[in-house]
Amino acid sequence: MSAASLYPVRPEVAATTLTDEATYKAMYQQSVVNPDGFWREQAQRLDWIKPFSVVKQTSFDDHRVDIKWFADGTLNVAYNCLDRHLAERGDTIAIIWEGDNPSEHREITYRELHAEVCKFANALRGQDVHRGDVVTIYMPMIPEAVVAMLACARIGAIHSVVFGGFSPEALAGRIIDCSSKVVITADEGLRGGKKTALKANVDRALTNPETSSVQKVIVCKRTGGEIEWNRHRDIWYHSLLEVASSTCAPKEMGAEESLFILYTSGSTGKPKGVLHTTAGYLLYAALTHERVFDYKPGEIYWCTADVGWVTGHSYIVYGPLANGATTLLFEGVPNYPDITRVSKIIDKHKVNILYTAPTAIRAMMAEGTKSVEGADGSSLRLLGSVGEPINPEAWGWYYNTVGKQNCPIVDTWWQTETGGILISPLPGATALKPGSATRPFFGVIPALVDNLGNLIEGAAEGNLVILDSWPGQSRSLYGDHDRFVDTYFKTFRGMYFTGDGARRDEDGYYWITGRVDDVLNVSGHRMGTAEIESAMVAHPKVAEAAVVGVPHDLKGQGIYVYVTLNGGEEPSDALRTELRNWVRKEIGPIASPDFIQWAPGLPKTRSGKIMRRILRKIATAEYDALGDISTLADPGVVQHLIDTHKTMNAA
């Protein structure tokens, strides 16, 4: 281990930590040798209505994949996040809300949040929402989004939060897949000083005849902007609350009853409805939040994610609130009104823990030290990174410039499907290496396998798999268990395949090398190449499209699209712009292509399979590293693409 790249645990951190090195080793050992005993003990941190007797019933056998934790116990998630804190922490701030406009902020106590959640839970019941019904939440980053999630959990409804940046078409697809009964939205969203037409997007989504399961649309007033109104379907959020009782008994839920669906991009195009259940998910979110962030009562914790992504679910809402923490909810973006926004929020609210994405870090880093000019930052004691691997340069900048060399960085690796953090340093236990996610969390058994599924020992690189279940693991894909099995358990039998590659160094530290399937990681958000390709070929002028990821200074991965036009169509800059706007409309701004290269043909095998490996190499100008092209039906296509790429780069 080279001393230059190693950041040992700081003595002052080790002295006050919840988990030092000896504790980590002892707890990790117990968690993998005796998972039943370990998780039985950890589950006592939750309040149960009916205690469980059986801890773990799990099988990764691809003929009968079945994952159950604490299956005969009952509890309620909202009770665990709210009610049980009222006696001792009722007047503690649960949510600090920071608006897009720096002049707007609110503080909401646990008692106030509990009252509003109960009112809205009663309002949902009044709209015929009951246990097992699906509610779609398409909201800006405002407290009402959290209220809606917890209100669903309180009455046993299943929430499906859809990121407010998704287009009406993408929203409709997600509503149709889960037969959503109610949609909760806002008149408009505010982000970076711009308004987003959320209610108008819902209206457009619901013109799709297949969305007929939706009975009501509940609208929260955010901007007061003018919107269309369907008096038979639309209801104001605030008018419902005005007449609702603040008393609502939490529904007794089985440990394995569904809590939420969250759609994530798949390599086959159609988004996957990742299904999480009640007890195991909540326990895992709470325990990882406490131990990874070394959270202590009274601290101000800020995760910059959106609740439309799993990071927002686990580490803005459920993990922090289950722990009685103060969680900061930010409506805006890191560079509005200017690049100092993050630093100003840290100082304004005396933030102790900052959990953000490499995309935001790179955006601040691009401005040098401007982002911290005039900032104090002395409240910070811990930094976190999530969404994609952080390159060592960005890690160093984050550590030196934002953390002033005083704050450990927890570089966390996990997925929508994992429910919570799987590989991460613990600040009081783990010596840090910039760019490494380091070591597994309790109960997590990672391994590397070659392409045939053979385990690789020692320092090596391979496909990252997990050998046994953990409580936060997704149980299925909504309405499609076969796809769940095919996606995660068929590639390497008896193991959970993450879809990521990794290397393990001589100290047993893991370094995530990125996706090995056709899924891109754009600004920490997963985008399926097939989803973007499908949107592109839906354009009347496009015959064929192939999407690959390329390195991007700000986003981590950029979207590079090769486009073959229909006969008679001519390439032009105007058409490039038209295609970019088309994809934005079909999927959302997040999927907007960074590069479009015209291609008279694509490199295909004789069976018709597009050789994306070759397209990736051309997109990154690695012309001499194309590998074997003898299997191509028309090898001449490759040289044409290389020539075009060189011309584009020279332009």
Swiss-Prot record:
Keywords: Acetylation, ATP-binding, Ligase, Magnesium, Metal-binding, Nucleotide-binding
Pfam family, one: ACAS_N
Cofactors named for this entry: Mg(2+)
Enzyme Commission number(s) of this protein: 6.2.1.1
Residues engaged in binding CoA: R191, G192, G193, K194, T311, N335, S523, R584
Source superkingdom: Bacteria
Record flagged with keyword Ligase: yes
A GO term for molecular function: metal ion binding
Residues engaged in binding ATP: G387, E388, P389, D411, T412, W413, W414, Q415, T416, D500, R515, R526
Catalyzed reactions: acetate + ATP + CoA = acetyl-CoA + AMP + diphosphate
UniProt-listed GO biological process terms: acetyl-CoA biosynthetic process from acetate
Chain residues that bind Mg(2+): V537, H539, V542
Gene Ontology CC: cytosol
Modification sites for N6-acetyllysine: K609
Keyword check for Metal-binding: yes
Cited InterPro entries: Ac_CoA_lig, ACAS_N, AMP-bd_C, AMP-bd_C_sf, AMP-binding_CS, AMP-dep_synth/lig_dom, ANL_N_sf
Enzyme's top EC category: ligase
PTM field: Acetylated. Deacetylation by the SIR2-homolog deacetylase activates the enzyme.
Sequence similarity: Belongs to the ATP-dependent AMP-binding enzyme family.
Physiological role: Catalyzes the conversion of acetate into acetyl-CoA (AcCoA), an essential intermediate at the junction of anabolic and catabolic pathways. AcsA undergoes a two-step reaction. In the first half reaction, AcsA combines acetate with ATP to form acetyl-adenylate (AcAMP) intermediate. In the second half reaction, it can then transfer the acetyl group from AcAMP to the sulfhydryl group of CoA, forming the product AcCoA.
Protein name listed in UniProt: Acetyl-coenzyme A synthetase
Organism: Pseudomonas savastanoi pv. phaseolicola (strain 1448A / Race 6)
Gene, per the UniProt record: acsA
